[in-house]
């Protein structure tokens, strides 16, 4: 899985090899183009997978194109890994506050951050079959691993090591998602930094971490790392955290984060 390793998202361990073989199989061979598709879906994240499977279940001829990891952010670098880490952080926080409920916790109880991240990778690998190329093929979707581009108003060209194909379509669904932009901060590139994607490749807890951006992702990661003991700085250009949310709700979150 050399191209996946280079992305910095997946450390080379057994669980991530299982994940990669499900969502970006190295020996995948793209099927022959099957005439004119009712719909070609670009991107196999949450939106793309749902579009493809609903179309196929209704009897449509569907092609699904993915150049990176099937499952998108949710499986690989979003919902699944973040909630695993957050759950572990909450368990640790509950344990530390257990005495206020009359529970006696033995002195010297510790957590293992490496084990927390290993559990996350194991859970992610275990459920990755649900978003795999083979499963969607079995469900009647033609899966193409490679980069797709519009060659005309009715064709998409797929290029990649799994085989180049030209796909004709009646409709196309663009489900390519988004990616966080890196702020233009002098020296940031030279200093090195994590993103909401690469942070889940950590194996050791950082002693100090600055989180730039206080949206939902920034806040949940900041709270999790703080609960594990990192000294966390949250930096937000706008007024307050969760600026797009109800202010009363955002203040409740802010107060809890400050306690953590």
Question: What does each model-identified segment do?
Answer:
Residues 2-37, 50-60, 65-205, 238-242, ...:
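Glycine-rich flavin
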Residues 42-43, 94:
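Generic signature of intrinsically disordered, low-complexity, basic-rich segments
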């Amino acid at each position: 899985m050399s191209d996946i390793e280079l992305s910095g998202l997946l450390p080379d361990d057994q669980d991530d090899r299982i994940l990669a073989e499900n969502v970006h199989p190295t020996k995948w061979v793209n099927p022959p183009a099957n005439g004119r598709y009712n719909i070609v879906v670009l991107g196999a994240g949450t939106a793309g997978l749902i579009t493809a499977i609903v179309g196929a279940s209704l009897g449509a001829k569907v092609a699904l194109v993915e150049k990176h990891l099937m499952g998108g952010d949710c499986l690989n670098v979003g919902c699944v890994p973040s909630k695993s880490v957050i759950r572990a952080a909450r368990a640790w926080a509950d344990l530390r506050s257990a005495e206020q409920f009359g529970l006696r916790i033995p002195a010297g109880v510790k957590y293992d951050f490496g084990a927390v991240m290993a559990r996350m990778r194991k859970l992610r690998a275990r459920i990755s079959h649900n978003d795999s190329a083979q499963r969607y093929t079995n469900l009647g979707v033609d899966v193409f691993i490679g980069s797709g581009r519009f060659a005309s108003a009715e064709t998409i060209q797929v290029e990649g090591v799994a085989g180049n194909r030209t796909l004709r379509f009646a409709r196309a669904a663009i489900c390519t998602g988004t990616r966080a932009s890196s702020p233009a901060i002098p020296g940031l590139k030279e200093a090195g930094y994590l993103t909401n994607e690469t942070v889940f490749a950590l194996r050791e807890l950082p002693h100090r971490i600055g989180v730039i951006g206080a949206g939902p992702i920034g806040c949940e990661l900041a709270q999790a790392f703080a609960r594990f003991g990192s000294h966390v700085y949250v930096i937000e250009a706008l007024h307050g955290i969760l600026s797009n949310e109800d202010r009363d709700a955002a203040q409740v979150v802010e107060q809890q984060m400050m306690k953590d």
